[in-house]
Amino acid sequence: MTPGYPLALSLAVSMAVLGSALPAQARQDDPSLFNRQARGELSEYGGARRVEQDLTQALKQSLSKKKAKNVILLIGDGMGDSEITVARNYARGAGGYFKGIDALPLTGQYTHYSLHKDSGLPDYVTDSAASATAWTTGVKSYNGAIGVDIHEQPHRNLLELAKLNGKATGNVSTAELQDATPAALLAHVTARKCYGPEATSKQCPSNALENGGAGSITEQWLKTRPDVVLGGGAATFAETAKAGRYAGKTLRAQAEARGYRIVENLDELKAVRRANQKQPLIGLFAPGNMPVRWLGPTATYHGNLNQPAVSCEANPKRTADIPTLAQMTSKAIELLKDNPNGFFLQVEGASIDKQDHAANPCGQIGETVDLDEAVQKALAFAKADGETLVIVTADHAHSSQIIPPETAAPGLTQLLTTKDGAPLAISYGNSEEGSQEHTGTQLRIAAYGPQAANVTGLTDQTDLFFTIRRALNLRD
């Protein structure tokens, strides 16, 4: 639901302690909980309103304190409230809504920050590695840390716990799968760029296999053995192991020797009928990050004043043989749901962040739309299944802001024409040159399904680890 609505939030907080809801499979959710489209003409009395009736009973009936069989966690990397609003305004219009991101009935906000490695003091602007470590392990750490605390000690993550409890596990991203967010479920290294043996020897020597460590992110991933991992990052698999049983072999050859099935396009992905510990699945659909959905000009100094308004265009490099985030999400659910013990699946829309860094509004908007479509797939499964908790949030906030179209802003700006036909000016103003930076504002977190009420109110990023662990009843 939209971030400005206090109604559902206050109801959720007050009713989280009420008795059990109807049995999950028998529950019929009120459609008004999910449909947040403006109800009429925006210029008319009440036309912009998104809620027409009292939702108390509907929200009460949506609550369940049962344990979840499955959890689907969807992360919009860099998807702060500003990024959601930018994308909604452009792609859906002022009165529109995202049928996934905006449709989860229980909403809260969480704090996120990392720690300085030497002092342990708060670092109020986290990177994606420390933030992913926070929700995957329940431990705050330093920027750059993957699955380790400020003392470089590893902590068991949600995927490892889910496996230990007999659940199927999945990890989907539009980034390189060695990138920070997916990597936090796959490995424990002291620096986030230790994708393969080469970087690990230089940047994470204590983790390198030749030094007695557990290996690079990719090498640890192959040992961790999740059932389904889909995304980019094929280039690292060409590197060669320097030590251990597979010394001298490429990481791809090692994966094949360990029994993994590797697919590289949509048709090959569609052909997969099962993925489990006997034959886990790896989908590698790009050498690095996967191509973005939409293209447009990057913002420039006074671009909103000196350049014409633009509309975003489809990226010709995102060809039909490359699966979308929604397609990868659907396939992962299809394969994981066969486990009678349930599953844990993390899905990341990675390039909201990457395009925000590049001050490219069309890039980040398209990736937000992509994530919304993935959320819709997860939500549809959860509604039909009745035993699945869906959570949608972000790892950190970012730099894009909506400003008045005529403003002479000090940063980089670009003017877009929205679905409404109105001008939308986007500003990136926290870096003089080069990459725009993360910001430290609290983030929206929203949920649907068993124990969804635990995301309401103010929580911390580390609470997400405990919320999921409790919902799935994961034991050490």
UniProtKB/Swiss-Prot annotation:
Subcellular location: Secreted; Periplasm
Keywords carried by this UniProt record: Hydrolase, Magnesium, Metal-binding, Periplasm, Phosphoprotein, Secreted, Signal, Zinc
Co-factor: note: Binds 1 Mg(2+) ion per subunit. Binds 2 Zn(2+) ions per subunit.
Binding site for Zn(2+) 1: 353, 357, 438
Family: Belongs to the alkaline phosphatase family.
Matches recorded under NCBIfam families: PRK10518.1
Catalytic activity: a phosphate monoester + H2O = an alcohol + phosphate
Name of the molecule in the record: Alkaline phosphatase H
